Amino acid sequence: FKDIPADRMGPRVRYKESIDAILSEPFDTKLVKPCVESKVFGIGVEAYTVGSAEFSLSYAAMNKDKCLPLMDNGHYHPTEVVSDKIPALLTFFPEIALHVTRPIRWDSDHVVLFDDETKEIAKEIVRCENGIDRTYIALDYFDASINRISAWVTGFRSFQKALLDALCQPSEMLKELQDTNQMSKKMVVMEQCKTLPIGDVWEEYCRQCGVEAEGWFDEIQKYEDEVLSK
């Protein structure tokens, strides 16, 4: 609702009944992964969102055999971070799903970058027990003001870099330092990790995949000039 509702529970009961009806249809849970996703607010629904965080998470918890909790890091209050929520959910759910995006003040779906929260999300996926195998990752962004192929490549590669960066860090060592209360050394090692040469590792990864590390934009520019602009 755009403004203050008179009945907050009724729409949620109807929403629950609707999802129940959808999930009552037979499907192969190995091939189809239904998800429930929350949102704090949106344009036109500033006062009340039926699928709140509490509603969606509660529904997923009560229906683990039929659906997964899905978190979009643009769907929460600006002071909340999805990276902190990942280990919380993986403690209770066998699998979770993510929409990785880049919010600016609200769920603006800007192109994913290799920024702090993107890196933190990747770290938690890697550091949680079997997190990579238990997390379904989708990228959720669009910016019509820039070349959409460039946007697609930039966002996709940014999260690949974030995962690669997380995989290169000494996670087991850091966990041991924390568990043995060596907090000063943990801080020092975590700071050292920030200046590790991830660029060199990324270039080698791209070389092994048979693609260019950073020289791809010229091809996109040529395609824009010769095809998209016609």
Q: What does each model-identified segment do?
A:
Residues 1-64, 68, 173:
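Active-site acidic/histidine proton-transfer and metal-coordination neighborhood
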Residues 10, 25, 30-32, 43-49, ...:
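Alpha/beta catalytic barrel-like cores
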Residues 52-62, 88, 120, 125-127:
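Histidine/acidic residue-rich metal-binding segments in metalloenzymes
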Residues 82-83:
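Acidic catalytic motifs of isoprenoid enzymes
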Residues 74-75:
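Short, glycine/acidic-enriched loop or turn micro-motifs at the edges of active sites
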